[in-house]
């Protein structure tokens, strides 16, 4: 791993450890916005009650918990993630549930002697600097007849909830996205995702596209939630802007959201 990717991973881990509690509170217990994909993902991999499942980059356990509900007494699901805080939350959230475990593991550096029937990975592949390494680890963890289910965001232009702020943020805060950060948009098309997965040795690949609508409320709700939930390093960069620039930034975001907020969908 080159040094710039190593720095990115360390920085990203620190951020996830900070935001995990807020992220969990806001998203993982609801079936709204992007998390409508959880149900779709599990439906597509067709979990059998006796399956052993690996959930890669499980975060605070949203997908893992959903999988566990599909399993019988002989089934088992293991959630893995690099964030110690996310894993701690996942364990607490699932402390009464049986036949599941959570372990601190880097998706780019793991191997299991035992093979799984299904591997899932929701909204994480694009965060891995070496996505190929992570995918090959997942493939090596599968039984020969096993299935992998992956969810990724579409291209940011098709995800206005993110692009409305990100496009303006990178204009007003030039280092908003630090050096070494992988292109989070790189698997946002069917062809790009299929090419990457095939390169890792997978076959019989099926890509499905879904649209999940989300109503963030009025613009002030959308904006205030952005300020409330962003990580400390980004908030510090925002607060370092002159007041006039912060106002310009906010107005630029508002302008971008008009076409969506009028429809109450973003």
Regions found by a protein language model. Give the residues of each.
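Conserved Class I S-adenosyl-L-methionine
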Residues: 2-8, 22, 26, 31-35, ...
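A short glycine-rich, Lys/Arg-flanked "PGG" loop and its adjoining helix->strand segment in the class I
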Residues: 132-147
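A short acidic, Gly/Pro-enriched loop at the edge of an enzyme's catalytic core
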Residues: 108-119
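A short SAM/SAH-binding and catalytic strip from SAM-dependent methyltransferases
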Residues: 117-131, 154
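Conserved donor sugar-nucleotide recognition element shared by glycan-biosynthetic enzymes
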Residues: 12, 30, 34-38, 83-86, ...
């Amino acid at each position: 791993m080159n040094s710039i990717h190593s720095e990115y991973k360390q920085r990203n881990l620190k951020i996830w450890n900070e935001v995990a509690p807020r992220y969990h509170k806001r998203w993982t217990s609801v079936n709204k916005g992007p998390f409508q994909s959880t149900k779709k993902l599990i439906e597509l991999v067709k979990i059998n009650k006796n399956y052993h499942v690996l959930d890669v980059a499980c975060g605070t356990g949203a997908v893992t918990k959903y999988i566990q509900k599909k399993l019988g007494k002989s089934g088992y699901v293991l959630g893995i993630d690099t964030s110690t805080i996310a894993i701690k939350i996942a364990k607490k959230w699932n402390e009464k549930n049986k036949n599941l475990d959570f372990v601190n593991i880097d998706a780019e550096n793991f191997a299991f002697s035992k093979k799984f029937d299904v591997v899932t990975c929701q909204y994480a592949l694009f965060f891995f600097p070496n996505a190929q390494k992570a995918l090959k680890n997942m493939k090596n963890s599968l039984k020969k007849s096993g299935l992998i289910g992956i969810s990724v965001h579409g291209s940011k232009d098709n995800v206005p909830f993110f692009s409305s702020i990100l496009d303006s943020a990178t204009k007003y805060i030039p280092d908003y996205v630090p050096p070494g950060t992988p292109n989070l948009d790189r698997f946002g098309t069917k062809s790009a995702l299929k090419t990457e997965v095939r390169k890792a040795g997978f076959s019989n690949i099926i890509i499905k596209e879904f649209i999940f609508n989300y109503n963030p409320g009025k613009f002030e709700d959308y904006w205030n939630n952005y300020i409330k939930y962003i990580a400390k390093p980004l908030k510090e960069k925002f607060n370092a802007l002159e007041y006039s620039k912060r106002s310009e930034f906010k107005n630029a975001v508002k302008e971008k959201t008009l076409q969506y907020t009028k429809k109450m969908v973003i």
